[in-house]
Every structure is written in structure tokens, then in C-alpha cells.
């Protein structure tokens, strides 16, 4: 008998559980093949810890300080140092007010960043908990699905195709597994693991199904030890590069402005040292978009949370910007475009042996199905029995071969009541035909039936049986007998056709990727209105038998196709690769372990609901709800998130140019020294307002969108220059003319620098903050309603700014209130000079894309006279097209706009009802055609009584 070791020795790995016989493993871990009890599992969890890697604890204070450590903050910190070190000259004391103000601005910004990121981090942690790996574990004598984190040494687990091995374990009795250890060892090919072998946490099961006993968890696993030696890295992606580019542009603009001021103020104008420093501080403080990293990060975090509420959990934050730019979506058919709720019409089952009927074929198929942990096919087959227990009634299961992508079938070896051994198998018809070695007329008949099913959009399932005279599970048995073919109907989702239409309107081309036959793909594409321009997977390799495809380059074929049939996972990778070579932003859905390479290769890998652990691990976005509509909703939400970020970056660049150019010209032309403290007030109020943009109401782009730095910089420079010139014009009117006195009847403030300071402060504050309403809108800013928070923040900030301009009397900032009369005049001037900003925006967009004027009149923007943005008109056109497709006469008065006959509400109700009926008819007719043609009838000879 083996020496027993204590838990402490096992924890310290003094016991070689990897090499000792499996029987000794059970002895050392004090467990059995009945599994652990829940109480014992809880005790061991306290000893060995949770089955997850150690998370480094964060120092909250250092994290807070970290928000002050970036290039933009460095510029502000340099300004703070200037205020107390370089400003200490010219017979004046250090500028403590500006120093304190800058530090307050930095602390406010860091505090908001810290709080928002902490909240976002907590929300993300809660979301990622939903993606925590699950495993099938034997506890209290029952198999159940539990979170992998509760596993302890001694637990019995089940590993099947697509699972990521949750802990280091030793395999028990069963068939060998194919294990992909590339994530751990770098081996590109799967390795075969036999009973008794060790499998490592983090590896992926590529084939087979077996039970195993856990020997190590968490940091004690092979993967845990390796991960402990290296620090994780975060891929900053394109977002960080864009952020850096914009930050560098702003810093360079400020540097250029400061250089010009230094070269003119000191050698030419002979300004005093302190006045020059104050003017340089104005450019430094006012020009830096200090809130930019915070605003953009918070916007993405909040957007990610919103996506999760819609059923799309983002594992990689920057996937949001890629989703916004996606223009091609390669979608699985089964479960995404269809319901994956299979049904079998027993009357259409094709039985081949003369001594069997359809019930016998169903029973054979049910025996080759799982009773528990079923997939959609198993559930539909077993569900046809009166009682699911009939599938195992009167037989003893010896061995079950689970489905795998290579064999594409399942099989059971069993003993009947008389003691004879048998096997039954079900699977892809071609595999079953090959298994049975069908020849001649029987093979031709099988293919005719399969093709007949496929033409009507029905999948085929082959069923076979054999006897096993040798009575061993390893023996080949007698020749297989082809039993029959079952038609599987997987109805399209009720919203798939409408969702595909929406996707096309949004500029996203949906391509169907299916492993089914070409005829099934074409029929499904016809029903969903996504086109029938589909090709077999052989065309991807240039082996198509269709002569019309021979001369077409493969990448062009992939780009123009509506979908591909007979696709294997490796084909998906090739499709993504070719689309990316054609400069498309490509999304790919997947659910199986073999989809992982394509999901990783795609710009946006999307693991559908109920995907395997391997597919989830490789994806960027994990869906928690089935269907295509979740993806399209996520596209819209991503575009809205991206629009908010782009709006802010244009705003930030504009403000930098506006502050640098405006104050530089005022300082150099009139030698007017604007107080740095007043720029700080503008910056603080601006930051407070701009933080709300992360929750702003925006209209997503109607086409795929992406970062276009030339658009951001061009728009920012033009708008910023215009605003700077309006400030220069305002100062000239107030400083050198009596324009405001004559126009608004206010007293002149010429020569009164303190009141000029107040007036200039208010003008800069108003137009700077109002700019956000221009950059946030695609159309006219006054017709696209902003979010409530943004509007309230703007009103409060400008109320504070106006009160400061009217009443302030701060000697250290050289400001005295200019009164309500001047404040009113400044507001009128600001409103008048605000109006051309929209026109400038359109001109810039037109110059860059040639499409800007559409934003003034297009139905996709808010500025339109069409009700619901033309939705009713589009629905009417769709309904009319469907009536024509079904041979129905056009309605005479269905869409009559005569308001004397029908009220507008009744008209809309009729239109909705018409559209709903036609959609139902569209689906019903397809089903009727399927059944009628399978019965060998001519549908044209049958009287039609379609009524609407």
C-alpha cells in the first residue's frame, strides 16, 4: 500500500501525482470514482484555494496617481512648475493661485477618471464573471455544471470536444483524446492522450470525451506556474495610437504657439519677463485637452456595459471601435440565422430496408443520441419518442462515440436483451453513405433523396446499424447497413430577414457560412432575402466544377458571394483572410473549437450563444442571446459609442487651436495679458461639461465608421481657427471701437483692462463650450437634440461663467465684473457667430468626402420632413415588393394617404398589419412549397387561395 501524504505535502507538490498509477492518485487524494461531496469540496477549497490564477492587488493610491502620469498631464504639471518657479521673477511673488488651480484641475480630472474607471472595472468584472469557465463535475453522486473555480484535487470532471481543460488532471477509462496544447507548449499539432495520461489546465479538447480526476488547481497547475513567471500585457491597439496622435498634435500646436510668442514678445516687443510667462501659461493650460484620456476611456467603458445589456459582452474594449467599422459579417446559418430548433416530419423519412419502418429508423437514431447534455439534433431525435427513456430501454450501453468534426457522426455500441451486440450510428449523410459503402442504385437513390430535401431547405441525417459478432467494443463488426434518411427542418428566425435588411441599410454585408449543402444554403438565402449567389467550399480552393467560376479570382469571388456552403472551419479562416486582404473590416461568428483560428483572425471574432469554451476564449465579443439581431444591435451601439469618441476628439483639437491662436493673436497684437487663472476656470468648467458626453444622445453613422485623423485634424483646425478669429474680432470691437455701446447701449470699457478681462473670458467660455453641440451632430446642431445631462451641464457651466463675468472682483486675476448689459451683448454676439460653425462643418466634410450635403437633407439624419425618417415609406415599398413576389395584386387603397378616408394612426396600424401578414405569408409559402414538392406534386396545378 502506498504511503499516504498530508494535504500540506500534496499542496507543496511533494507527491508525484503526475506519474504514479491512477489507483494511487485516488488513494493519495482520498477520493473515489463517486466523486466528492459538497462539504468535502468546500473543505478542500479552503486548503488549496480557488481554481484560478492569483490576481495582483492594486494599490488604489498609486492607481490614482497614475492618472496624472501621461504626456497630457506632464504638460499641465510643467505649467504648474512654471507658475511657482519660472514665474518667480520681475519683482513678483510665485503665482501660487495658478499653481493651486492647476493642481485642482489635475486632481479633479484624476478623481473623475479613478471613480469612473473603478465603476467600469467593477461592471466589467461582473460581466466577465458571466464568461467564467464552466465544467461538468461529479459532486454528491450527481453530474452537474459548475464554475471551474470551485474545483479541487480529487474532483471528477468530464472533458468533451470544445472544452478548455479546467485543471491539471489524470484521464480515466475511455477512448483517447486529441488535445491541443499549443497555448502551453507551442506544439502546433494536437497530441493524443490515453487513459492514465495527464492533461494540463488551459489546453483544449479537439476530439473525444472522457472522465478525469483533478490533481492540481489554480497556481499549482502547469499553466499557473508558467503564468506566474511572466507579467500579462495589454494590447493597446489602434485606439491608443489614435489617442497618442491627437495628443501629440495638440502638444505640437501649443509648442509652436509658445515659440512664436517667445520670439516676438521678448526680442521684438521687449515685454517684461513675468508678462511673457503668464501668456505662455495661458497657452499651456488652456490648450491641453487634459480630460481626453478620461472621456474616451469612460465612454468606451460605459458603452461596453450598454452592449452587455443588449446581449453582447466585450472581452476586448477596443473591439468596439472595430465593430463600428465592420462592413462584412460572416454569419453561421444554424442558430444565428435559424432557430436551431430542429423538427423531423416522420411522414417524409426515407426508409431503405424493407423490414423496417420510420419508427424503427427513429429508434436507431435515438439510440445513437445522448440522453443528457444534448445538442439540437439529439434533442429533436429523442424528442420524437413517446418517452426519452425508450432510447435506452432494453439495452445496455457499452460504448458511446461522441460527435467530432472529423467523423461527423455519433455511434453507440450496446447489448440487447438477448445478449447480442449491436452498433447504431447517425450523422452527416455522406459520412454514413461512405461508412456503409453504398453502391449502385441504392447510392443513387440516397443522393436523390438528399438533394430533394436540400432543394427545400431541409437538412439530411443518415442512420446506419451493424451487428458485432466479436462482442468487443474494439472490433470492426459486420458490414454496416444503411437504415434511412431523416429530414431536419431548421426554421429561420422570425427576425432574420428584417435584420439582414437593416444590416444592408447600415452598410454591413452579411454572408452566410454553413456546413450544409449548397442547395440548403441557396434556399435559406432565398427565404431570408439575402441573395442566392452562393458557392460550394470547393470554390475557395479553386477546385470548383462550375466553368463560370474558373476565371474569377478567389478573393473577388469571396467578396461578391452571398455565402458559402459545405464549409469546414479551415475554410472560415481563408474567407476572413481574403476579405481582409481586400481591405474589409470583417466580423466572423463561431461556436466550435475548430472555429477558434478564424475567430482570432477576424477583426471582430464573435462567439455565439452556447459556444464552446475554446470559441469564447478566441473571440472578442461573446453573445449571451441567440440570433443575428443581437449582432446588428451591437453594431449600432458600437457606432454610437464611436461617434461620441470622435465628436470629442474633434472638439478637443478645435479647442486647442482656438485657445492657442486666439490668445496668441490678442497677446501679440494688443499686448493684452490674459490671466492664466481665468483660463483655468474655463478649463475646469469645460471638463465638467464634457464628461457628460459619454452618455450623450447621438445618431450613429449610417455607414461603417473608423478613425480618420485627416478629418479630425482638418475639422479641428478650421473650426478652431474660425473661433479664434471671432475672439480676435470681439476683442477689437470691445477694445478699439464703440460697436457694443452703440448696438446694445452699454457703457464703453475701452482702456479698462479688468472689465475687458471679464468680457473676453465670457466670450471665450460661451463659444468654446457651445462648440460641442456642433461636433456632436451629423446634421444641423440645433435639430439634433443633445442628451439631458450634457444640456444641463452646459447650462450650469455657462450660468457660473456669466455670474463670474458679471460680478467677479478678483485682484489676483486682474478681473472686475462687466455687468449684465455687457453679458447680454456677449451672448448675442456668441449666438450670431455660432451659426456659421455648422456650415463650416458641412464644407469640410464635403471637401473630404463629397457627401456632406446629404446631412442637410438626407432621411438618415434628424433634419427631414419625413415621419419616422421615412420608415413607413420603406415598409410600404417592401410590402409591395413582397406582394409582387407572391403574385398578389397591388393594394388599391392600402397605402392611400387621403386623410379624409383614414386617420394617420389607423393608416400606420394598417401598414404594420400588412407588413406582418406578408412576412408570415413569406415563411408559410416557403414551407408549403417544401412539403408539396417533396410529395411530388406540381404546385402550379393546385388552386391558390392566398388572401390578404
Curated annotation (Swiss-Prot):
It is a multi-pass membrane protein. SUPFAM superfamilies: Calcium ATPase, transduction domain A, Calcium ATPase, transmembrane domain M, HAD-like. Residues 946-948 are annotated as: Interaction with 14-3-3 proteins. The modification Phosphothreonine is found at residues 884, 947. GO terms for biological process: proton export across plasma membrane. It catalyses: ATP + H2O + H(+)(in) = ADP + phosphate + 2 H(+)(out). The active site is at residue 332. The modification Phosphoserine is found at residue 930. Belongs to the cation transport ATPase (P-type) (TC 3.A.3) family. Type IIIA subfamily. Binds to 14-3-3 proteins. The binding is induced by phosphorylation of Thr-947. Binding to 14-3-3 proteins activates the H(+)-ATPase. The plasma membrane H(+) ATPase of plants and fungi generates a proton gradient that drives the active transport of nutrients by H(+)-symport. The resulting external acidification and/or internal alkinization may mediate growth responses. This is ATPase 8, plasma membrane-type. It comes from Arabidopsis thaliana (Mouse-ear cress). The lineage of its organism: Eukaryota, Viridiplantae, Streptophyta, Embryophyta, Tracheophyta.
Amino acid at each position: 500500500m502506498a504511503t499516504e501524504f498530508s494535504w500540506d505535502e500534496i499542496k507543496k507538490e511533494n507527491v508525484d501525482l503526475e506519474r504514479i498509477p491512477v489507483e494511487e492518485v485516488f488513494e493519495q487524494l482520498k477520493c473515489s470514482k463517486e466523486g466528492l461531496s459538497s462539504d468535502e469540496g468546500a473543505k478542500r477549497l479552503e486548503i488549496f484555494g480557488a481554481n484560478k490564477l492569483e490576481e495582483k492587488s492594486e494599490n488604489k493610491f498609486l492607481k490614482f496617481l497614475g492618472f496624472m502620469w501621461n504626456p497630457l498631464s506632464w504638460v499641465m504639471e510643467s505649467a504648474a512648475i512654471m507658475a511657482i518657479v519660472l514665474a518667480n521673477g520681475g519683482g513678483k511673488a510665485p503665482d501660487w493661485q495658478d499653481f493651486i488651480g492647476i493642481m485642482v484641475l489635475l486632481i479633479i480630472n484624476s478623481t473623475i477618471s479613478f471613480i469612473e474607471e473603478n465603476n467600469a472595472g467593477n461592471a466589467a468584472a461582473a460581466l466577465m464573471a458571466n464568461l467564467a469557465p464552466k465544467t461538468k463535475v461529479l459532486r454528491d453522486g450527481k453530474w452537474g455544471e459548475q464554475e471551474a473555480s470551485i474545483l479541487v484535487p480529487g474532483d471528477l470532471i468530464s472533458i468533451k470536444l470544445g472544452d478548455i481543460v479546467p485543471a491539471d488532471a489524470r484521464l480515466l477509462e475511455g477512448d483517447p483524446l486529441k488535445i491541443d496544447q499549443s497555448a502551453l507548449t507551442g506544439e502546433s499539432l494536437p497530441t493524443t492522450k490515453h487513459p492514465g495520461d495527464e492533461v494540463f489546465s488551459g489546453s483544449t479538447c479537439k476530439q473525444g470525451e472522457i472522465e478525469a480526476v483533478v490533481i492540481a488547481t489554480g497556481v499549482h497547475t502547469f499553466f499557473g506556474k508558467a503564468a506566474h513567471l511572466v507579467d500579462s500585457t495589454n494590447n493597446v491597439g489602434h485606439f491608443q495610437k489614435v489617442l497618442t496622435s491627437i495628443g501629440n498634435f495638440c502638444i505640437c500646436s501649443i509648442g509652436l504657439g509658445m515659440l512664436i510668442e517667445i520670439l516676438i514678445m521678448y526680442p521684438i516687443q521687449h515685454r517684461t519677463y513675468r508678462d511673457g510667462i503668464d501668456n505662455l501659461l495661458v497657452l499651456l493650460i488652456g490648450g491641453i485637452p487634459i480630460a481626453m484620456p478620461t472621456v474616451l476611456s469612460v465612454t468606451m467603458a460605459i458603452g461596453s456595459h450598454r452592449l452587455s445589456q443588449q446581449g453582447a459582452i466585450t472581452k476586448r474594449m477596443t473591439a468596439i471601435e472595430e465593430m463600428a467599422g465592420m462592413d462584412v459579417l460572416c454569419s453561421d446559418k444554424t442558430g444565428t440565422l435559424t432557430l436551431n430548433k430542429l423538427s423531423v416530419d416522420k411522414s417524409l423519412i426515407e426508409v431503405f430496408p424493407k423490414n423496417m419502418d420510420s419508427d424503427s429508423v427513429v429508434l436507431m437514431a435515438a439510440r445513437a443520441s445522448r440522453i443528457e447534455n444534448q445538442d439540437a439534433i439529439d434533442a429533436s431525435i429523442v424528442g420524437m419518442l413517446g418517452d426519452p427513456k425508450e432510447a435506452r430501454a432494453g439495452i445496455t450501453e457499452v460504448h458511446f462515440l461522441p460527435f467530432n468534426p472529423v467523423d461527423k457522426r455519433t455511434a453507440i455500441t450496446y447489448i440487447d436483451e438477448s445478449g447480442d451486440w449491436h452498433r447504431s450510428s447517425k450523422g452527416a449523410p455522406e459520412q454514413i453513405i461512405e461508412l456503409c459503402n453504398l453502391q449502385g442504385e441504392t447510392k443513387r437513390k440516397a443522393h436523390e433523396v438528399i438533394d430533394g430535401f436540400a432543394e427545400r431547405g431541409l437538412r439530411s441525417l443518415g442512420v446506419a446499424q451493424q451487428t458485432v459478432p466479436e462482442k468487443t467494443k474494439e472490433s470492426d463488426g459486420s458490414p454496416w447497413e444503411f437504415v434511412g434518411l431523416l429530414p431536419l427542418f431548421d426554421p429561420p428566425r422570425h427576425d432574420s430577414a428584417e435584420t439582414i435588411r437593416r444590416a444592408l441599410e447600415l452598410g454591413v454585408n452579411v454572408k452566410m457560412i454553413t456546413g450544409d449543402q449548397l442547395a440548403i444554403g441557396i434556399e435559406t438565402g432565398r427565404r431570408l432575402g439575402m441573395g442566392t449567389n452562393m458557392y460550394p467550399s470547393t470554390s475557395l480552393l479553386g477546385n470548383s466544377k462550375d466553368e463560370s467560376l474558373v476565371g474569377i479570382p478567389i478573393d473577388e469571388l469571396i467578396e461578391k458571394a452571398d455565402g458559402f456552403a459545405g464549409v469546414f472551419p479551415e475554410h472560415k479562416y481563408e474567407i476572413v483572410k481574403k476579405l481582409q486582404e481586400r481591405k474589409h473590416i470583417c466580423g466572423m461568428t463561431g461556436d466550435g473549437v475548430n472555429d477558434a483560428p478564424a475567430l482570432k483572425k477576424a477583426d471582430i471574432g464573435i462567439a455565439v450563444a452556447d459556444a464552446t469554451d475554446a470559441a469564447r476564449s478566441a473571440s472578442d465579443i461573446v453573445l449571451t442571446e441567440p440570433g443575428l439581431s443581437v449582432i446588428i444591435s451591437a453594431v449600432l451601439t458600437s457606432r454610437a459609442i464611436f461617434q461620441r469618441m470622435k465628436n470629442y476628439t474633434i472638439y478637443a483639437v478645435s479647442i486647442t487651436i482656438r485657445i492657442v491662436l486666439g490668445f496668441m493673436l490678442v497677446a501679440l497684437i494688443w499686448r493684452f495679458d490674459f490671466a492664466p487663472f481665468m483660463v483655468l476656470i474655463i478649463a475646469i468648467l469645460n471638463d465638467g461639461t464634457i464628461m457628460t458626453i459619454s452618455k450623450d444622445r447621438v445618431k450613429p453613422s449610417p455607414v461603417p465608421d473608423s478613425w480618420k485623423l485627416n478629418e479630425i485634424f482638418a475639422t479641428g483646425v478650421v473650426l478652431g481657427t474660425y473661433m479664434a478669429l471671432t475672439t480676435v474680432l470681439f476683442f477689437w470691437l470691445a477694445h478699439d471701437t464703440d460697436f457694443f455701446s452703440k448696438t446694445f447701449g452699454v457703457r464703453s470699457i475701452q482702456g479698462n483692462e479688468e472689465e475687458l478681462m471679464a468680457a473676453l473670458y465670457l466670450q471665450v467660455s460661451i463659444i468654446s463650450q457651445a462648440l460641442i453641440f456642433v461636433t456632436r451632430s451629423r446634421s444641423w446642431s440645433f435639430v439634433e437634440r443633445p442628451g439631458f445631462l450634457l444640456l444641463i451641464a452646459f447650462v450650469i457651466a455657462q450660468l457660473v461663467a456669466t455670474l463670474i463675468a458679471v460680478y467677479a472682483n478678483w485682484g489676483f486675476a486682474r478681473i472686475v465684473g462687466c455687468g449684465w448689459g455687457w453679458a447680454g451683448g456677449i451672448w448675442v454676439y456668441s449666438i450670431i457667430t455660432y451659426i456659421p460653425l455648422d456650415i463650416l462643418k458641412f464644407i469640410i466634410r464635403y471637401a473630404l468626402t463629397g457627401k456632406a450635403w446629404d446631412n442637410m437633407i438626407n432621411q438618415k439624419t434628424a433634419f427631414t420632413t419625413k415621419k419616422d425618417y421615412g420608415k413607413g415609406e420603406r415598409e410600404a415599398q417592401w410590402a409591395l415588393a413582397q406582394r409582387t413576389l407572391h403574385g398578389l395584386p397591388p393594394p388599391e387603397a392600402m397605402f392611400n394617404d387621403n386623410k379624409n378616408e383614414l386617420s394617420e394612426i389607423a393608416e400606420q396600424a394598417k401598414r404594420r398589419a400588412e407588413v406582418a401578414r406578408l412576412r408570415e405569408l413569406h415563411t408559410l409559402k416557403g414551407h408549403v412549397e417544401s412539403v408539396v414538392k417533396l410529395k411530388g406534386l406540381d404546385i402550379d396545378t393546385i388552386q391558390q387561395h392566398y388572401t390578404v
